[in-house]
């Protein structure tokens, strides 16, 4: 069973790791598109409703995505048809439940939307750990930046964040 709970040092998880793009869409999506092309990346995983919607709207279709249908801006992802399947899971705030972890394991294979009842934020760590080589994980930072993580470049360092999670 794989379940993690954020118990301490929440501040470390709010830090804008490692490429923060402080531009509004479509420019932010264009920057990631260029990063993908220039870096030879093959997979893009988005975490969050606004990021996923922006990628879809501006033609950069994620390999898979995780959404919770709750945003500060009231934006909903409506183009689930861009994906082969939708997997619904329960994942409370500050957790990566076993159910959510299993859904991300399926999602890294491609074509899956993980639709979360609860909160999807922590699933970015699951994507970082499970994504295949040549992947980018993208999510929105609460202060407005688009965060893009080239997994091969940063995985080892970012996985140290698991040291601050408790097994549940």
Curated annotation (Swiss-Prot):
Pathway membership, UniProt: Cofactor biosynthesis; coenzyme A biosynthesis
Catalytic activity: 3'-dephospho-CoA + GTP = GDP + CoA + H(+)
GO MF term (any one): kinase activity
E.C. number(s) listed in UniProt: 2.7.1.237
Regions crossing the membrane: none
A single GO BP: coenzyme A biosynthetic process
Binding site for GTP: 49-51, 68, 70, 120
InterPro entries registered for this protein in UniProt: GTP-dep_dephospho-CoA_kin
Keyword Transmembrane helix: no
Described function: Catalyzes the GTP-dependent phosphorylation of the 3'-hydroxyl group of dephosphocoenzyme A to form coenzyme A (CoA).
PANTHER family per the UniProt record, alphabetical: GTP-DEPENDENT DEPHOSPHO-COA KINASE, UPF0218 PROTEIN TK1697
Protein name in UniProt: GTP-dependent dephospho-CoA kinase
UniProt source species: Pyrobaculum calidifontis (strain DSM 21063 / JCM 11548 / VA1)
